[in-house]
């Protein structure tokens, strides 16, 4: 019981010391550069409607889909010890075959061609 009281009091003391230091220590003066917004190198006063490559968007969505599907493969090694291993291997092979068919389809449709 006394340990909890000591911990709470020490946390309160550290918090009070930090608040006291933040209140009484001098703050830095802001100049023009510190007061202006920084938008990753873009001018924030221009229009936000910039052209965006649909090709990049398609590749990003495909990456997310295939990444999620690959993450679904993580439980299969553990399932080999729990269930019938031939059944689990059949399901994993079927799952990978579906992924491969989807990848080949996207490749033949030109979804992975970066330059046209």
From Swiss-Prot:
Family the entry assigns: Belongs to the complex I subunit 3 family.
State the protein's purpose: Core subunit of the mitochondrial membrane respiratory chain NADH dehydrogenase (Complex I) that is believed to belong to the minimal assembly required for catalysis. Complex I functions in the transfer of electrons from NADH to the respiratory chain. The immediate electron acceptor for the enzyme is believed to be ubiquinone.
Q: What is this protein called?
A: NADH-ubiquinone oxidoreductase chain 3
Q: Which organism is it from?
A: Pisaster ochraceus (Ochre sea star)
Q: Which GO terms describe its cellular component?
A: mitochondrial membrane; NADH dehydrogenase complex
Annotated membrane topology is: Multi-pass membrane protein
Enzymatic reactions? a ubiquinone + NADH + 5 H(+)(in) = a ubiquinol + NAD(+) + 4 H(+)(out)
Q: Where are the transmembrane segments?
A: 4-24, 56-76, 88-108
* GO MF assignments: NADH dehydrogenase (ubiquinone) activity
**Entry keyword Mitochondrion:** yes
Q: What EC number is given for this enzyme?
A: 7.1.1.2
Which keywords does this chain's UniProt record carry? Electron transport, Membrane, Mitochondrion, NAD, Respiratory chain, Translocase, Transmembrane, Transmembrane helix, Transport, Ubiquinone
Q: Which Pfam families match?
A: Oxidored_q4 (PF00507)
Q: Which domain of life is it from?
A: Eukaryota
Q: Where in the cell is it found?
A: Mitochondrion membrane
